[in-house]
Structures are given as C-alpha cells and as structure tokens.
C-alpha cells in the first residue's frame, strides 16, 4: 500500500501493457508508462528487505545443503597412474585447518589425461570441514556447457541429481544483456529483473528451499545455482558477480561464491581481453572467503602469480572484516599439485609465492624431461604458391594437403589398429583447424573426387566427422555423446582396441571393403579442452603453443607407454597468414597483435620454434615451454612463439613498476594499489566492467531459430525479432533466402562418407519423446 498517496516523487514505473485491459495490446507503443511506486514506499521497502537479507547471510552457508562423506571422493585409487590423487588429498587434509583460517590457493598442473577432474574434487573435499561438508562450484573454461559435458562430470564424480547442479548453455550475449539492463534502467525497475539469463537451464533435483532464497527470488534456476552442494557451469555463469552494473544479475553468483569454494578449470584458455574479468572473479572469491583452485597443465607463471595477487588482495579485505584476528597479516595456504609430487607453503606476498612457484615448476620440468614421450610432432612445410592462390582454391588445396598428412600418419604401425576379424587397418585421428569459417569449405573439399590421389581410391575409406562450437546445442551434444563413447580407449592393448568393438564403428568398418579406414574428426579449437577423447594421431593448423599442448593431450590420452614415432604433424603456418601475410596470423585464437612488441616477425614455425626444437626432425610435445620461462629469463616476443605468450601474460596480469603507465586493459587494475596510503578501490565502482568488457563482441548478430514446418517433418530457418510488446517474439521466415543446403551430389564421394549420422529433427523428436 502507498504510504502517502500525495507523495510527489516516484521511484519507478510499469508498462501500460501490464494493465488488465483487453485493448492494451492495441495501445500506442510510445504511450507514457504508468507511475508505479512512490519514492518513500520504495526506499522503506528496500530498507526492510535489505535488513532481513543482511541478518540472514551469516547463517546461509551453514543452512544450505552440502556434500558429506561422499565415498567416491575418499576412496583410494587402485590405479598407480592416479595415486597422485591420494597424496594430494592427504596433503590437503593436513592443511585444512590453516586453509579455513587463512584461505587457500591451489595450483593443479597435472598433465592432461591424469584425472584432474576427480583429483580437484578430492582436494576440495579434503580441505572442507568434515562437519559442514563440501560446497564447491566447478567452472569450466568453455563458452557453452552442453548437457553431455555436465553428465560426464557427474559420472566421473559419481554424483546424484540431488548432489550436483548442471548449468547448461552459455551466458547471454552482451547485446541482449545490455538491452535488458537499459530497459530496466528506463523504467526504474532494475530490481525486477530475473537473476539469471532466461536462455540457460539449471538441472538440479535437490532441496533448494531456504527462507533467504525464497525472499530473494522465485526463480527456481537461481535457487538451484545457489543451493546445490556442487555446481558445474562455465565461468560465464559466475562472472556476473563482478560484471553486472544494474539490476540483480550479480546476486546469485555472489551468493554462490559466498557459500562455497571455486575450481577454475583451464583458466588459461581465455582470450587475453577476458583476463581482467577472470581476475575480478578471483579477487571477489577471495573477498567472499572462498578457497580457489586453478586446474590446467599449461598454466604460465604470470597468470598464476597474477591470480594469486588478486586472491590475496580480496582475502585481505575478508580477513579485516570477518577474521577472528583482523589485524593479523595475510598468510595464504598455497598448494602445488601434479602427478609427480605435491608441496605446500604459506605465502604472505607475491614475492614468496613467485619463489615457491618457480621452485615447483623447475621440479616439474625436470620430471617431464625424464617422462616417457607419448606425443612426437614434426613440422610440415606448406606450398609457397598458396600466397598467389585464390582463397577458394587455397582451401581446396589445404583439404588435399591435410588428408595426405593424415594418410602418412595412419600408415605408421603405432598410429593404427588392425582389426583381427577382417585384417583392416583402422585409426581415429583429429584434424584441428584454427577457425570455423574456412572449416566448412575444407570439409566440402574433402568430398571432392580428387581429394585423395587416384592410387588410394579403393584402398582408403575416410569417415569424416565435422565438429565445432557453432552447431545448435542439441546437435553438438549428440555429436559429443557419440565421440565420447567411440574415443574412450581405456583398457587398450597392443592386440585389443576398444574402439573397434563399438557397434557404431563396427558397422562402418564392415560396410566398406577398403583395407584402410581413417575415422577423422575435422574440428575447431573446441576439440582442445573439456573433452576426454583419445586419438591415434593429429594434424594441426597452429594458433598458439598453449593450444598445441592442450590438443596433444588428446593424442594417446588413455594409453600409457612411449610412442614408437611421430603421431602429430603441425603445419608450418596457418591459412590466415596466406590470406593476409602482413597482418597478425596467430590471433583469434592466439596471442599476436598488430602492435609492437607483440607482432611476430615471421609466421613460420620453423623460425618461431628454432630455439625449442633445434635441428631435430621431431620433438616431444609437453607443457615445458608453457609453464616455465627461458633459462635466462629474457623474452623475445617478436621472434619466439612461446615468448610471445609469456610476454602477453606478464603485460596484462602483473603490476608495472612505479612511474610507468598502466595499460587500460591491465587485469591488475582490479586490486593493485600503487599508493596504498591513498587507495583508489576501483573494485568498489563499476568502471572496470565498462572499460574491460567480458566477452566483448562488437559484431552485429541476429538471433535465428529452426522451427518445424506444419507437417513437423522439416526444420525451417527463422529470424527472431522483438514484437510490439515486451517479451513478445516474432519469427520471420528466412529459410529460402539464407539457408543453403548442400546438394546430396556434392557429398557423393567415392572415398569419403559422413560420420556419425546425426539429424537435428531426429534428435528433437527423441528429446520430445523422452520428456
């Protein structure tokens, strides 16, 4: 009720369209909105509401569900390869009291394929108070989380639907996010916004009823995100904690960080422009009392140190306000974990952390140098005449070249399996491309009659799977489900490959008479992270050393033992270089820029990797160049591929010496105070999220939808447009003008056939029937 009907000031408005009037939809769209709340009612209501919320916050963590005594997280590993998990959990348990008092910053650098997912959960479980249990968010370094990825995580940890929430999808686009913020600002009703992006889905079957959550929102997705003991999501789902400027989008992720710990999976996979936002998230995690774990085999020193400094700055604020000893100096419990050894040390400042981290990395590098070599790579030269070719012809020639490299790799005995039933030789390989745009043309070119030389016709059968991030989410999830099954090579022996006994693969081998079968995934960079796949070999169009190392982790991932020869071919450069030779080639993805000192003088890997590989024809691909600085600590970012990455990270994440200018996009602006006696406290303002945009995308985009026709037999493309009323959507048919199906004749190759056979209409029908 209005406290004073005659109060002259109003706080907000509401749209005419909300009136219960059958004629409201016919009213002029430009008509003035109705005044809603008087200012006195609004302010007194906010005060009462905020008081109740603030009084409930201290007990929130103790009241929410937690994971207690989960046996799979305590079970000792029977496999010697995963014994490091037991040692890591034991070490974490031994320092849990220190971590509870002073915070914890954990670095897990175990090699790809060593079971970091389960290891991370076991470490965080060991750190948690046994009396209250584990509450933790696992944030993946992906833009979009498919249900298939979430279910794999759930199965790895043996969690029920009452113990884990899976936030499927990606965060809203920047344009859509800003549009609704502007709409809320225009009406003064920002507090009425939904707390989560409407496009996402949170799958959780547990108890999400808590008085505070009921008061904050009636959004079941927000309840689940906050209440679930364990949450698996993308970093995009948590960054609104620091990136939202209006409304309530920050509330749910803030409360998630306030009531649990944080694991960042593959944090070094982010674009350089997104590292400031990642730094802000880690700073806030420290400020709200979370313990943080970074998990990646390719963590560069500057990134680890920069995120530690951000966490320390946040933790110092937390300690001043919520610690039992607020005047005590900050001393964070730090842990370093990998498959070789584990270490812990209290670090009061950046210098102590840097020294301890450097010492640990040196030990790791020494172990990597002694380890068995499972991935051997060589550089493949590219034709000089590509510079003068038309782009379409160059892409066709690229398709022929990578198929030739794939055939050469397949022929090595260590890169294929022999089917005992038929004597056919079978391999599963990956051709990684740097960008999606040329991938479509390259895939079509592989179906051309001349894609394989005449002498291989009738001898070689290519089974081609195209896989990238721009598929409709349901279709991408279906492809991933099949790849996850087929590329699980656990239990493989010299005379036994589990892949050959999968019914889907078996049927394809038996239905084609050729003696050689190459199952090829032609994929974008999405193939590098988040997928537990084991390939026999890989052909790589390069982007960065980081991506090369991550991709190498998908080759012989499940099969220990030294490889008998080369199983990776890295092209000497990429297609972007031949399209624009004077422009940066290793960007988007990559670390090169147009500005010195971060523009490379050469785009040929035989120049950029000369120091690393010397005169060797083949070299071992592992994490050494990414995790360690050069022995002389001198970086030449314009001449060396790995130095470029280290220099970019150092420039963005670490504070500059006093007296030098700090770049506008420096990640350290969130926490670094050049003059502590006069702090700027930029993190208390909304300036940085405006000038250092997360997932900045200036390209204009349209929303489109595939809708079934009247007979529900065909999907037709429509453009999604805003209607007259708020939230109204119009679907404008554009199928005839913008959708160009590939003629069946263009895919009728004598040697190449599509694999797997996945149809969106069939997947939709199956999903509808299942629900």
Residue ranges and their predicted role:
Residues 545-568:
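Conserved SF2 helicase motif VI
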